[in-house]
Amino acid sequence: MKKLSFQQIILTLQNYWQDYGCAILQPYDAHVGAGTFHPATVLRCLGTKPWSVAYVQPSRRPGDSRYGMHPNRMQHYYQFQVILKPSPDNIQELYLKSLEYLGIDLKIHDIRFVEDDWESPTLGAAGLGWEVWCNGMEVSQFTYMQQIGGIECRPVAGEITYGLERLALYIQGVDEVRELDWNGQVGEKALKYGEVDFEAEWQFSKYNLELADSEMLLRHFKDSEDQCERLIKANLPMPAYDECLKASHAFNQLNALGVISVTERASYVLRVRHLARICCTKWLEMNK
């Protein structure tokens, strides 16, 4: 198997899905916990208009902060997201062909679809799903998106999320994310993943777990919550959704700090879900 660099894996997936007919979008410029939170998924999976896109999304999960010391868990990582709406009958076959396009021989590697129905409590989103395992390592999530913002997706969209770091660990045959070949160069031009991202990983872990100001984050959450409601009343669901994302990230930061009780956590989840629901509802009203 050819050992593609991290950036070659991204380019290969972009080329594959572009050839299929997907528009290649750019990452969303907001702090999100997963590629699913990009408005190209949350808003565009609603309604009847066909929508086929693919994009890389840098994602942040403050609760996964490990100061860069964990072999494959970070507070900042990358996903490659594909949305096909309506979901084609051969979506599983398309996914498997994308693995072959990456140089993974399906005849000699153990590819398994492990049932794992997906749910995002803060988005009010859910769907039938499977984790995709390659030789015992999870590399992707495969979901039939049935509901977002508490609204049924009609038609159902197919979502494929590649965990780029884990996929690269497998393709390159290394044990730690920091050792991944980033750019495929040799000598002075060679870059490893750790040289690109791990100083930031340590600093943001320090911030997320030790130095973030909980009182400030509580104010930010309430401010974003109020702004979202105000913008919905002004019929502006897209900037309102930005405020929903800000509230969601503030909640994740508070959760990472350990300053929210179990009861409070449930309340915050419901508050973010409400924001997502009103954004999705207003978007659908304006884009039928």
Swiss-Prot record:
Q: Which Gene3D superfamilies match?
A: Bira Bifunctional Protein, Domain 2, Class II aaRS and biotin synthetases, domain 2
Can you quote a single GO CC term? cytosol
Q: State a single Gene Ontology molecular function.
A: ATP binding
Q: Which PROSITE patterns match?
A: AA_TRNA_LIGASE_II_GLYAB
- Cellular localization per UniProt: Cytoplasm
The reaction(s) annotated as catalysed by this protein in its Swiss-Prot or TrEMBL entry are:
tRNA(Gly) + glycine + ATP = glycyl-tRNA(Gly) + AMP + diphosphate
Q: Which InterPro entries match?
A: aa-tRNA-synth_II/BPL/LPL, Gly-tRNA-synth_heterodimer, Gly-tRNA_ligase_asu
Q: Name one Pfam family in it.
A: tRNA-synt_2e
**Record keywords: Ligase included?**
yes
The kind of enzyme this is, by top-level EC class, is: ligase
Keywords of this protein's UniProt record, alphabetized? Aminoacyl-tRNA synthetase, ATP-binding, Cytoplasm, Ligase, Nucleotide-binding, Protein biosynthesis
Q: Which residues cross the membrane?
A: none
| Entry's Gene Ontology BP terms | glycyl-tRNA aminoacylation
Say where the protein is mainly found.
cytoplasm
Q: What is its EC number?
A: 6.1.1.14
Look up the domain of life of the source: Bacteria
Coiled coil (UniProt feature) = none
Does the entry feature the keyword Protein biosynthesis, yes or no?
yes
* Sequence similarity: Belongs to the class-II aminoacyl-tRNA synthetase family.
Q: How does it assemble?
A: Tetramer of two alpha and two beta subunits.
Specify the protein name.
Glycine--tRNA ligase alpha subunit
Natural source organism: Rickettsia peacockii (strain Rustic)
